[in-house]
Amino acid sequence: MESLKQAIRERGNVLSDTVLKVDSFLNHQVDPKLINEIGQAFAERFKNEGITKVLTIESSGIAPSLVVATHLGVPFIFARKKKPLTMTDNVYRSQVYSFTKQETNEITVSKDLLHADDRVLIIDDFLANGQAAFGLCEIVEQAGAQVVGFGIVIEKSFQDGRKKLTDKGYRVESLARIQSFKNGTVQFVDEFVTQLSK
């Protein structure tokens, strides 16, 4: 998605060989025009899949998930990292390691919200090693529901999250696939492939 790549180039900040900061437009401050385009792109890719719920983890996945769900006309659920007092123990739960925060969280979703007949689209801001993705898959499986696919805003293709998911048979749609953060700059997969073919 060209507008997303442009935002990454112009407003993203490479902090290391594995970390990209996008808090000026995606996961702290949100660019409403861009997030709407992101939502439209995922909705278009998954429009014929009979999606009944969109699922993400709080908090960075909330903005894109809400917009995707709006375009698909279905509810969205965010797995909570901290169980509020208002949530009973009637929950699905999974352990998820955060690459960025270097910590493990127990994520929960109320059993009242996810059911065996649901067809679930999982949305997240980043895909690196697939920890969050598999944690959300586990919750969907506990409900007896079906994961239809993954919508990833930014994929770090140099890490193995995509391979792990596709090896398990999951569909993965990423709007920006990053090959590397070499020398503090972002190189996208399609640009890398173009360079190799020259």
From Swiss-Prot:
CDD domains: PRTases_typeI (cd06223). One of its GO terms (biological process) is xanthine metabolic process. This is Xanthine phosphoribosyltransferase. Signal peptide: none annotated. Keywords: Cytoplasm, Glycosyltransferase, Purine salvage, Transferase. The lineage of its organism: Bacteria, Bacillati, Bacillota, Bacilli, Bacillales. 5-phospho-alpha-D-ribose 1-diphosphate binds at A128, N129, G130, Q131, A132. It is found in: Cytoplasm. Pathway: Purine metabolism; XMP biosynthesis via salvage pathway; XMP from xanthine: step 1/1. It comes from Halalkalibacterium halodurans (strain ATCC BAA-125 / DSM 18197 / FERM 7344 / JCM 9153 / C-125) (Bacillus halodurans). Xanthine binds at L20, N27, K156. Disulfide bonds: none annotated. Coiled coil: none annotated. Homodimer. It is an enzyme of class 2 (transferase). It holds the Pfam family Pribosyltran. It comes from the Bacteria. Gene3D superfamilies: 3.40.50.2020.
